């Protein structure tokens, strides 16, 4: 009976392996059929007979072979490289490959049958079938093994139902086949292997304490490298006795530090690493292995969890300094002003040396807003890479050079899955203007987000799944197996240093206490915390393992713990009288700069440039190579600019900007301009990058001014505000010599990056003593384009202004724009600059300047006079100061609306005074100017609604000024749009009616 049942199965197996009616061959058969319909003699006689019997309609056959009209002719692209593709499942190809190899071996006498005789055709078929099935099983482990890995230290995670997808029986192997050697063509580092030998390697590699996800990677070289690195009989996680003792020592330091603070400062927030101590030896391994592979610097960013441990055990911050902060002391010397921040937000830097390789480490200060430090770290790393290479032209920096600086980001599991800025940063990782040769992401996966379980905080199996979108390899690892964690860190570092791509380590661990030390986690996670209380610490578990291996004794471990505690006691005593001796914020690249003071209230800097130099730069700005085909509209643009440079008149906004950039570049200041569509400019005004109309080659005049100049980079960024602005802020922290600018497509969209403005740009210097010279260009102006294309929300930035933290300007002339940009680099301190930039003024006939206004003794003016006061050829001549009836103060584009309306009405007793810089507020200068008009009525006019714009900010300042000059009118009158919920109307008729109304109010 059994034999009868077996026979049909055997026949089916042979048929399955030999039949041409296999799904993978469908395309081939259809093409053959179409060929037959064209010319029956063009196919083999056997096929001819076969097709003749089908009797299908010839047109249908041809149509079928062509496929649908929308298909791409070159699609799908044939897989290359690896024996088995991760995606195509083309087993017929594999079978053919294996069969050919087996036939070759049989012919050479290398492959023999059971009786020791050469393989028969049937035995070759059987052997090929075994090989294909074995490779299918191996592929299943590579793809799905991580789901069966032993990752959760608490053992609470539910085992997935795998439908026996990894069982040998699923691939046709019975226990009777287990002793048979199967040809696997060195797939696991073995030419032949039995099923148990394969399972031993596969389970150890993919289902142990490490689970690897890499089959989503499409680059065959990267996949093959990972397989080669972890698969094979000799690829076990193995450490020398010294290595194991070093891991134990680091774990004891990490655990001992947390326990010591818990005793000394009971209940104080420290966001301890308890439960995730394996992080510390893993970070050491990253620095050590990276150093061996050429790493020079690591820029770290991390949240609060375990930060103090990283600062002290990895960064080498003195324990006494941390204990000093715990008792409420400041982290800065007494003579340094600042508002300070909590201890688990502070940064630090140090040098570590392993095996003679010195690596500089810097931990970036950050707010509590999770993951927002990520782009800042990437930007800092990019600037450090540029400084290391010393870029002078638009050459591409090789990724092997960029790889010398590593951005290393530590994440929480819930935040990595939840915060959108994570995906934005992953999106930046491969872009030319933002790539950093791969960020190493380390997720401290304590399987909870404050009080929220993973099932409620993400829709994917792992927190790391978002990283699959950029094909990053992901190493999941059990935090209670320190050797596995250190091994994963080592392989991840090697991958990054080899391929210069991002990589993720997802360390499953737990949080021994609550979210902070004053929290009771059992309210919401009773079962998890019951398991945690019964669970031994990582140090206990690893100590027991090493004792069992005979490497250490319990006495050795107790002695190591006691020695460490004694060291901490000494540091604790020293911390009671500890005084920080110097602030490090003006070291390194920042040497030579100082903190700003009010000794020079105008703070102009020397921003003028000789006319001769400006003309030389201008000449280069309009030159293109002979064989370069410029678009005819761009050629007109260049011709107009050439005329401006020749006459020295009519300098428009974009030309003034290019002259500012060019003059800084020849003075050795690199320019980095980033944002959406900045090469051309949202309003087609900039055109600093030209494209050949025939081959799309680029030419950048600003990089061809003179030999030895600094580089100009215009980077069309991805469609993101938050990550890109954070990145540029980070860049500005590392390179104070560079003018770093971020431009919003419209200022209205800048609030997509509000966290960066609030947490870093406006407050970073006061909180963390970190200066930045970042410039934010925010197109702003009411022109009837509706509520999302009118307002950069000037009021938001003014509300953030205090303690001389940043500058806010709304300038109206190209000359003033030229000077304010150069001023950023021409003073010995750095402050962020928030600029409301124009839209309609870019081509306004009045918004022009002369070369004379950019040279000589000229400089930036915080206030600008009425053009009618000093331009002789204006339409009206103003009355003398004493006869001026009203002074209308304003800022930005509305000045030109007021000017034209006044001219139209022939009014000569209303003076228009522009406030070009709103903060720091030019109070003294305003006292001088308004003293001329003590008896005049004072009006503040703005185009924004009353609850927006500068009104609420400037009103108290203006009252203070009027009191000081003893003005007749002590209150300023408001003229502008009424308060509104939405910034602007979308109806042009309503826009014009509102404009007419407030112009009447201001001038009537």
From Swiss-Prot:
Coiled coil: none
Highest taxon listed in the record's lineage: Bacteria
Record Pfam families: 2-oxogl_dehyd_N, E1_dh, OxoGdeHyase_C, Transket_pyr
Family annotation (InterPro entries): 2-oxogl_dehyd_N (IPR032106), 2oxoglutarate_DH_E1 (IPR011603), 2oxoglutarate_DH_E1_bac (IPR023784), DH_E1 (IPR001017), KGD_C_sf (IPR042179), ODO-1/KGD_C (IPR031717), THDP-binding (IPR029061), Transketolase-like_Pyr-bd (IPR005475)
Cofactors that this protein relies on: thiamine diphosphate
Alphabetized SUPFAM superfamilies for the sequence: Thiamin diphosphate-binding fold (THDP-binding) (SSF52518)
GO cellular component: cytosol; oxoglutarate dehydrogenase complex
Catalytic activity: N(6)-[(R)-lipoyl]-L-lysyl-[protein] + 2-oxoglutarate + H(+) = N(6)-[(R)-S(8)-succinyldihydrolipoyl]-L-lysyl-[protein] + CO2
GO biological process, one term: glycolytic process
Molecular-function GO terms, alphabetical: oxoglutarate dehydrogenase (succinyl-transferring) activity; thiamine pyrophosphate binding
Keywords per UniProt: Glycolysis, Oxidoreductase, Thiamine pyrophosphate
UniProt xrefs under CDD domains: TPP_E1_OGDC_like (cd02016)
Leading EC class: oxidoreductase
NCBIfam families hit by this protein: 2oxo_dh_E1, PRK09404.1, PRK12270.1
Family of this protein: Belongs to the alpha-ketoglutarate dehydrogenase family.
Function: E1 component of the 2-oxoglutarate dehydrogenase (OGDH) complex which catalyzes the decarboxylation of 2-oxoglutarate, the first step in the conversion of 2-oxoglutarate to succinyl-CoA and CO(2).
Binding partners and assembly: Homodimer. Part of the 2-oxoglutarate dehydrogenase (OGDH) complex composed of E1 (2-oxoglutarate dehydrogenase), E2 (dihydrolipoamide succinyltransferase) and E3 (dihydrolipoamide dehydrogenase); the complex contains multiple copies of the three enzymatic components (E1, E2 and E3).
HAMAP family: SucA_OdhA (MF_01169)
Protein name: 2-oxoglutarate dehydrogenase E1 component
Chain's gene name: sucA
